[in-house]
Amino acid sequence: MLILPIVKGEYKKDYNLKHLTWFKVGGNAEIFFKPLDSEDLKSFLIQNKQKLPIKTFGAGSNIIIRDGGIEGVVIKLGQNFSNIEFVDNHLIVGSSCLNYNLAKFCQANAISGFEFLVGIPGTIGGGVAMNAGAYGSEFKDIVVQIEAIDFAGNFLTFTNEEIGFKYRSNNLPKNLIILKAVFKINKGDSENILLRMNEIKNARSSTQPIKERTGGSTFANPEGRKSWELIDKAGLRGYRIGGASMSEFHCNFMINNGDATAKDLEDLGDFVRQKVCEDSGVKLEWEIKRIGRHP
């Protein structure tokens, strides 16, 4: 019998995750848990005597949940983890805060350096985890430190150097949940910041299929190369498997055309990797995460 820790937050069993993802595919979470606050999360982790497998879930913007669902507990940090506050000339931001919301907050408060976030879907926690970046900036450029908790329930702090930011990755321990990020503040001009944000939004809408069911960039760019160019060169623009296709508009974006399964999407991505490797000798690395069980 499955015995769950006593918590103040909310449990849901056999919870459908499909509606939480941008691709709108995938199976159910065996257990879905939204902690009330960081102390509630700590209590859950300490009590997790059965050592149930744990996965964390953000905005669902760059993830494929496999059709067999996710075993164990999926933890989603809700609105109580999305606060933005000023402390000693720094911003402390909850990990579930959306990148877009932080960009808007910074513009309203004449804080520069965060404009690029308006073009990156997802949460602050996810952005830190993958060192998300666009339009010449990355999270490594603005993060001072993060506050996190490990799966044993220990609160930890990591500086920018300790995080070890790399291209779309970092050196943080795997069994870690990011709670907050601390950012440095550089004052700017609100109107100029808004102009830059609008430039980024316009550039994004003119080059990316933002109105489709997509998960953002499918593959990370190899050093000195562009993934979309390699995909295009291999003749895979618009290529389709089942209900999934590579976008005609931007061929490093995978799209659910309405009836795709998670398997369709993952099979398509793996096929593209194989064909690009055969054509160009380059092995593309997934930027979209794939988690869960195959059916």
UniProtKB/Swiss-Prot annotation:
The entry's keywords: Cell cycle, Cell division, Cell shape, Cell wall biogenesis/degradation, Cytoplasm, FAD, Flavoprotein, NADP, Oxidoreductase, Peptidoglycan synthesis
Catalyzed reactions per annotation: UDP-N-acetyl-alpha-D-muramate + NADP(+) = UDP-N-acetyl-3-O-(1-carboxyvinyl)-alpha-D-glucosamine + NADPH + H(+)
Pathways per UniProt: Cell wall biogenesis; peptidoglycan biosynthesis
Cofactor(s), by name: FAD
EC number: 1.3.1.98
One Pfam family recorded for the sequence: FAD_binding_4
Subcellular location: Cytoplasm
PANTHER family: UDP-N-ACETYLENOLPYRUVOYLGLUCOSAMINE REDUCTASE
Stored NCBIfam families: murB (TIGR00179), PRK13905.1 (NF010480)
Name of the protein in its database record: UDP-N-acetylenolpyruvoylglucosamine reductase
